[in-house]
A protein has these predicted regions:
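ATP-dependent adenylation/nucleotidyltransferase module used to activate substrates
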Residues: 154, 158-328, 332, 340, ...
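Catalytic subdomain that performs nucleotidyl-dependent activation
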Residues: 243, 321-402, 406
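Rhodanese-like catalytic fold shared by cysteine-dependent sulfurtransferases
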Residues: 51-59, 63-69, 75-109, 115-173
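The feature marks non-catalytic terminal segments
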Residues: 374-453
Length: 453
């Protein structure tokens, strides 16, 4: 009798999910194997490799340093927001097998990971079929991050307990992790980050006395840092203003929401969370769902902020966002415009939008994040596993990444290219412009050409 059906992928996956059935089936196969070993041997190898394909965070921690290599399968726009220490970027699908073999030949275990462990498991199973045995990290980067955060919270609790005991004995207290992070803003990153934050507020007149500002937190590094900077500004108490730290849950998956809440707790940011159904609303939209999502999010934030008595919302766009937007407008939109440091809302009377991170460089934000061992998410969309276009401002990742890479390339030739792009919208000479728009009305140079003769 032939047992070729056992090679069916779906059948094997179902067996993997039912251990009792698998044990029974393997016992059955051991009897059949004596009669027909040829067909069974391939199955047994496949079952063995697939049953051992996942590795947990706990198991990963137990591995000796240098005995394994992590391969990050996420794209550049995600890896730029953080990678597991020691990981390298995985090669594309065609080169992945060769990359894995290279590390396996060095006697190392190869561990793949993606955002949640879905794609990495599929890739590991595919490589197993080719006889290349690699592992997939359970839960992916998100699962690793949650496990790490839990560990750090336990360490912080121990520090607090030790400090209580030290206080009673008159011993010196140890700084908590939150205090260390706040200290880094005042000391190490004062010039690169806090001073530029204050400069933007003064230069563009972003904060006035008695303002009540909703600090809009998406969960990424930019908005979380902005929240800490506002707390530091308020600590100086130059004039009175109030803050609300606003988080909108537009339909986050459970893990992403937990990461946001854990980071807020670590950073001592008292967030106010409200829910909406934006993700469900844009789920069926094929064209530009991210753009629509970004527009809808802003509307919800304005509405909730106004309900809470705020007169301003603050967004975490930084210097690099500004210059990329200027260049993208020219290259993809055939227009010259910038991301403004502040705007009056057209739909919510009395409300303003401010961008106090306007002068802060993204590399400095990343340096602050990495120096403090912080980990954030880029897009908390519940479609993160399969969506490759999400970006907080609604622009596709590919376009923004292309523009970012183009600027970096131009900088190799001209080191002033970034500041030149930024200043280009400050030095517009209307006499050298063919046409411009104001309040929706287009004006041509021909309108006044003869009058200027």
């Amino acid at each position: 009798m032939e047992w070729l059906w056992i090679y069916d992928q779906q059948c094997i996956q179902q067996l993997m999910q039912n251990k009792d059935l698998l044990l029974y089936f393997e016992s059955f196969l051991s009897i059949i194997n004596k009669r027909n070993p040829t067909n069974i041997v391939g199955y047994e190898r496949k079952v063995e490799s697939m049953s051992n394909i996942n590795i947990s965070y706990k198991e990963l921690k137990q591995l000796e340093k240098g005995s394994y290599q992590l391969l990050d399968m996420r794209d550049e726009s995600n890896t730029s927001y953080g990678m597991i220490p020691g990981a390298v970027v995985a090669a594309d699908e065609e080169e992945l097998a060769a990359q894995a073999k290279e590390y396996l030949d060095q006697g190392k275990k190869v561990i793949l990971y993606c955002t949640k462990g879905i794609f990495s498991k599929e890739a590991a199973e595919k490589l197993a079929e080719e006889g290349i045995n690699v592992l997939s990290l359970e839960g992916g980067y998100t699962g690793w991050l949650l496990s790490l955060m839990k560990e750090e919270q336990e360490n912080d609790q121990k520090t607090e307990q030790n400090n209580k005991e030290a206080e009673g004995k008159g011993k010196k207290k140890e700084l908590t992790r939150t205090q260390e992070i706040e200290k880094s803003i005042r000391k190490k990153f004062h010039k690169q980050i806090f001073s530029k934050f204050v400069k933007a507020i003064k230069t563009y007149d972003l904060v006035q006395e008695n303002d009540k500002i909703a600090i809009c937190i998406s969960g990424g590094k930019d908005s979380m840092l902005m929240a800490k900077l506002f707390q530091e500004l308020k600590r100086h108490n130059k004039f009175h203003f109030d803050l609300v730290f606003l988080v909108m849950d537009p339909g986050y998956n459970e893990m992403n929401r937990q990461i946001i809440e854990n980071n807020a707790k670590l950073l001592d940011i008292p967030i106010t969370v409200f829910e909406s159904d934006i993700f469900d609303a844009v789920y069926e939209i094929e064209k530009s769902p991210c753009y629509l999502c970004a527009r809808m999010r802003r509307g919800y934030l304005y509405s909730k902020a106004k309900e809470l008595g705020c007169n301003k919302i603050a967004l975490g766009h930084h210097y690099d966002d500004v210059i990329e937007t200027i260049l993208m407008g020219m290259l993809y939109g055939a227009q010259v415009q910038t991301m403004m440091p502040k705007l009056h809302s057209t739909n919510f009377e009395g409300m303003e939008l401010i961008r106090p991170m306007y002068l802060i460089r993204e590399d400095d934000i990343k340096h602050w994040r990495d120096y403090n061992g912080l980990h954030f998410i880029q897009c908390a969309c519940k479609f993160t596993d399969t969506c490759t276009t999400c970006n907080p401002d609604g622009v596709t990742k590919s376009k923004r990444m292309e523009t970012k890479q183009l600027i970096a390339k131009m900088k190799e030739i001209n080191p002033y290219v970034e500041s030149n792009i930024f200043k280009s919208v400050e030095n517009v000479n209307l006499k050298t412009i063919i046409a411009y728009k104001k309040d929706g009305v287009k004006h041509s140079f021909l309108d006044t050409y003869d009058q200027e003769n």
